[in-house]
Amino acid sequence: MEASHLQIYWHDSQPVYSLTFQKNSANDKLFTAGGDNKVRIWKLNRDENGQNGGVRKIESLDFLGSLTHHEQAINVIRFNSKGDVLASAGDDGQVLLWKQEDPNTQQESVVRPFGMDAETSEADENKEKWVVWKRLRGGSGATAAAEIYDLAWSPDNRNIVVACMDNSIRLFDVGAGMLVCGQSDHGHYVQGVAWDPLNQFILSQSADRSLHVYGVILSSAGVVTGLKLRSKIAKAELPCPGDVLRTNYLFHNETLPSFFRRCSISPCGGLVVIPSGVYKVAGDEVANCVYVYTRSGILNSAGGVKNRPAIRIPSLKKPALMAAFSPVFYETCQKSVLKLPYKLVFAIATTNEVLVYDTDVLEPLCVVGNIHYSPITDLAWSEDGSTLLISSTDGFCSYVSIDTETQFGSRIEPPAMHAEPLDTDESAVAAKNQREAGGIVNMLPVKKIPCNSSDSKKRRIHPTPVDL
């Protein structure tokens, strides 16, 4: 593995809030979004020979274009599974759906920003031209929509769910361009959403210290007609020093210095990695962690204190802000702790570090630190799983290049997915780790580092810098 910076001004020195790779693209195209109200398109030029131990470094970048129809900062961008529609959303409260313009399309079809004609528009200088296909707005009017922090596509690309600053999530029908429903069950900003790849549930994570599980309501024709709140995960009975069980909060409160809490569901739908976790180490002293739930744990949860995670990944020096699974499946080299017939890889980002794990051993394969001066905002894996891109509020992006065959083993075809819960023998997991008090286990035998989460008690809209 090799980590490096990409030293360019991605968004005119403004923060970079989100990034994503275009799926099913013949080229390595990266899209970034930031505080300059623009989405920008880049082509990654790699070392195809892999002269650095099989690692394909990014040698240079080509700028391909800017998308300029947002009126305020853009917080999230995501492609649908086909890779032909890009969704972007941000502080202006609208979701824009972009499609690449056919070179044979007449110039008059391009929707230009107000006040710009064909001669003055920045769009005419782009190597690629993307047009706004649809605009999605929540609320009853143009000014009623709240700021959007995160979004997720449905697996069939028919719907989009967004996380809003007014404590709600909103569900849109992409084809109709209409709002299907909204849910206002959270007590604070919603900072992350994820859609189950098997289309059974949606997860939303909020600054109110909870994760909500919503069941997806489908019509007989398979059309999403609404959402139903299944459970709220906020507290659980967790093992504490002295082999006792105590009811504690699972997640950080609103003082967490980040816009985002981006949880991630594995591409098979069997695992959920949830950031911003905390746990008691002694008295009122808390430490940072990440919680891992199985699919059955999510679907069968009642939302009570006994809804314990399957695994706790502890000993993070700073709060975890987001997680992201690689889309690639690998042959398992040994018996998986979770009894998976394949190996998955995921990354966790704290405010100042990125850690890469696999599901075989659940120990860090690498820890990348001191890469940014201010908090990390997003993670994006390339389609082949060989590159992990990282964005930050310092206005820069960095990356980790990986020789996947050496680090992870041979790739396999994705297994056939079905909508039945994944059964996990949690007692076997507990026995393996010699833990009998409770269903949550520490997989990493490393020193626990307390979190200084009490340094700041004020409520904030914008994150404040942290000391690295």
UniProtKB/Swiss-Prot annotation:
InterPro entries from the UniProt entry: CAF1B_HIR1_beta-prop, PTHR15271, WD40/YVTN_repeat-like_dom_sf, WD40_repeat_dom_sf, WD40_rpt
Pfam families for the chain: Beta-prop_CAF1B_HIR1
Subcellular location(s) of the protein: Nucleus
WD repeats: 11-52, 69-108, 143-182, 185-224, 371-413
UniProt keyword Chaperone, yes or no: yes
GO annotation, cellular component aspect: CAF-1 complex; chromosome, centromeric region; cytosol; nucleosome; nucleus
Record key words, sorted: Chaperone, Chromatin regulator, DNA damage, DNA repair, DNA replication, Nucleus, Repeat, WD repeat
Keyword DNA damage recorded: yes
PROSITE patterns: WD_REPEATS_2 (PS50082), WD_REPEATS_REGION (PS50294)
Gene Ontology biological process terms in this record: chromatin organization; DNA repair; DNA replication; DNA replication-dependent chromatin assembly; nucleosome assembly
Function text: Acts as a component of the histone chaperone complex chromatin assembly factor 1 (CAF-1), which assembles histone octamers onto replicating DNA. It performs the first step of the nucleosome assembly process, bringing newly synthesized histones H3 and H4 to replicating DNA; histones H2A/H2B can bind to this chromatin precursor subsequent to DNA replication to complete the histone octamer. Plays a role in the maintenance of heterochromatin.
Assigned protein family: Belongs to the WD repeat HIR1 family.
Family annotation (PANTHER family): CHROMATIN ASSEMBLY FACTOR 1 SUBUNIT B
Misc remark: Present with 2130 molecules/cell in log phase SD medium.
Subunit structure: Component of chromatin assembly factor 1 (CAF-1), composed of MSI1/p50, CAC2/p60 and CAC1/p90. Interacts with RTT106.
The name this protein goes by in its record: Chromatin assembly factor 1 subunit B
Annotated organism of origin: Saccharomyces cerevisiae (strain ATCC 204508 / S288c) (Baker's yeast)
Name of the gene encoding the protein in the UniProt record: CAC2
